[in-house]
Amino acid sequence: MHEVATTVSSAEMSSPPVAESWCYTQVKVVKFSYMWTINNFSFCREETGEVLKSSSFSSGPNDKLKWCLRVNPKGLDDESKDYLSLYLLLVSCPKNEVRAKFKFSLLNSKNEETKAMESQRAYRFVQGKDWGFKKYIRRDFLLDEANGLLPDDKLTLYCEVSVVQDSINISGQSSSNNLKVPECRLAEDMGYLWENRRFTDCSLFVEGKEFKAHKSILAARSPVFSAMFEHPMQESRKNRVYIRDVDPEVFKEMMRFIYTGGTPHVDKMADKLLAAADKYALERLKVMCEESLCNNLTVENVADVLILADLHSAEQLKAQAIDFINRCSVLGQLGCKDRKNCNSNQTMDIMETAGWKSMIKSHPHLVAEAFRALASAQCPPFGIPRKRLKQS
């Protein structure tokens, strides 16, 4: 017979299972105690098997279960003749049976409980049935005055009883969790804050156009703005910032990104927006612009895009532009007229474009890089930047 080992993950162990229905069972237990004092214990009969019984007792006046204690001062039989035997006896019971646990102890001369012994489980009692300990305590130990168990020749027995009563079941159906957490509206709320200029504390001027903003938000989103407001510069003292080399519409789109993390018009101004993102250290916006430019590379614009990527250290875009040039050059040498491979609507060679000719004069190092890459090109698949966009 083979056993199949299964592994339970820590996550499965930490989260409790959920059931469609459930039941809670309450087992009622009645607890009570009884004390029995046997005076002049040393005069008790010494014959093995002889019995002393206490009066009957119960948990209360309305309890129909009656109990008593039974003692064999010199043991129940020959095996236990050197011991005192002690039992709990069910005297009367209206039921067929009852289950109970019990604990016996002696009270010493200081009225302290000692020599405690208890049942390990709830035993089944029927009327006239008893349970207990045949060898409860050795007689010589009990009779030794030094042990203080028979003060004034009195044996005091203390009994605690726990009777199991009827159980009660409470059941029901689990209600499914119908709570629906609303979608996060942080971007919309921040956009509303930006559009409505509420609680603004600084002004940004772009070609004479004023933009109201919040310094804390600008500082949290842009390391450049953070340094600007943190240090005792003119912008920090007067809460007025003059933005240069950025078109107002481009700046507005950049501010929308700062507040909301989105830029719906990136494809219309990706080149200028990339420059602004680089200037204000908005890394995620910069990669978004790289992605847009990469998706829209053409034979006519690839040289300009390569220059832009080099100028603003957009390394992913730069690599993609060089790959594009290499691919189109290789396909051109093979006589391929599949315009889709070059993402172009013209068959004009890249090196004949005005952008390429301008790059030869203004950025000859890029031409050299393109040719070096072409010489060792393995024609890798063309795709969008591989760098994952960071969450705003």
UniProtKB/Swiss-Prot annotation:
The entry's keywords: Nucleus, Ubl conjugation pathway
InterPro entries for this protein: BTB/POZ_dom, MATH/TRAF_dom, SKP1/BTB/POZ_sf, TRAF-like
Gene Ontology terms for molecular function: ubiquitin protein ligase binding
Main location: nucleus
Domain of life: Eukaryota
Pathway linked to the protein: Protein modification; protein ubiquitination
Residues of the MATH domain: 31-161
Gene3D superfamilies reported for this sequence: 6.10.250.3030, 6.20.250.50, Apoptosis, Tumor Necrosis Factor Receptor Associated Protein 2, Chain A, Potassium Channel Kv1.1, Chain A
SMART domains: BTB (SM00225), MATH (SM00061)
GO CC list: Cul3-RING ubiquitin ligase complex; cytoplasm; nucleus
Transmembrane intervals: none
Subcellular location: Nucleus
Database matches in CDD domains: BACK_SPOPL (cd18519), BTB_POZ_SPOPL (cd18343)
PROSITE patterns: BTB (PS50097), MATH (PS50144)
One Pfam family per UniProt: MATH_2
GO BP annotations, alphabetical order: negative regulation of protein ubiquitination; proteasome-mediated ubiquitin-dependent protein catabolic process; protein ubiquitination; regulation of proteolysis
Domain BTB: 200-267
Subunit structure: Homodimer. Heterodimer with SPOP. Component of cullin-RING-based BCR (BTB-CUL3-RBX1) E3 ubiquitin-protein ligase complexes containing homodimeric SPOPL or the heterodimer formed by SPOP and SPOPL.
Function: Component of a cullin-RING-based BCR (BTB-CUL3-RBX1) E3 ubiquitin-protein ligase complex that mediates the ubiquitination and subsequent proteasomal degradation of target proteins, but with relatively low efficiency.
Similarity comment: Belongs to the Tdpoz family.
Name of the protein in question: Speckle-type POZ protein-like
Gene: spopl
